[in-house]
């Protein structure tokens, strides 16, 4: 069973629908016991970094998620991916979950923001749907795929059991479903493979 973390911020219905379309058993919850019982966790997110971190703190999820990320497959999507890192410079400096070393920084001012629309992944070679103005800056060894948008933007990162997708797989049609399926089949079944 996959649990989608419900902390009041995120595009939950679409990611739930996408995972169910792949035949997954899915629950949407903020209940720590149910989240702890899940085989894998998905942290969605839409909006701004600081309010999202505040919601995670209000719901008592920060330490729990930090611990769970060392025990089971954990997927952060869009803002959910950004929250995995140590901090963001959005609206000042905001501390993140710190599950992945690295920061989240505003994309260059010489490109149109937000970065919205379809963009081809360098390694997978297929287009996925993005909506964001900030991107991760992290160890290149963890970047599974990327796009070029004013700078190198990590589109998929993976370290141990933790995976982040900056784009919205649930809004990326068949390609998004394929990438979610790859995450489920590889990351959830083996800590040694990457998507």
Curated annotation (Swiss-Prot):
UniProt keyword terms in alphabetical order: Amino-acid biosynthesis, Cytoplasm, Glutamine amidotransferase, Histidine biosynthesis, Hydrolase, Lyase
Reactions catalysed, semicolon-separated, are: 5-[(5-phospho-1-deoxy-D-ribulos-1-ylimino)methylamino]-1-(5-phospho-beta-D-ribosyl)imidazole-4-carboxamide + L-glutamine = D-erythro-1-(imidazol-4-yl)glycerol 3-phosphate + 5-amino-1-(5-phospho-beta-D-ribosyl)imidazole-4-carboxamide + L-glutamate + H(+); L-glutamine + H2O = L-glutamate + NH4(+)
Signal sequence interval, chain numbering: none
Give the molecular function GO annotations: glutaminase activity; imidazoleglycerol-phosphate synthase activity; lyase activity
Domain (Glutamine amidotransferase type-1) ranges: 1-193
GO BP term, pick one = L-histidine biosynthetic process
Q: Where is the active site?
A: 78 (nucleophile), 168, 170
Its Enzyme Commission number(s) read 4.3.2.10, 3.5.1.2
What is one term from the GO cellular component aspect held by the record? cytoplasm
Q: Where in the cell is it found?
A: Cytoplasm
Which InterPro entries does its entry note?
Answer: Class_I_gatase-like, GATASE, Imidazole-glycPsynth_HisH
Pfam families, from UniProt? Answer: GATase (PF00117)
**Presence of keyword Cytoplasm:** yes
Subunit structure as annotated in this protein's UniProt entry: Heterodimer of HisH and HisF.
Q: What is this protein called?
A: Imidazole glycerol phosphate synthase subunit HisH
Q: Which organism is it from?
A: Exiguobacterium sibiricum (strain DSM 17290 / CCUG 55495 / CIP 109462 / JCM 13490 / 255-15)
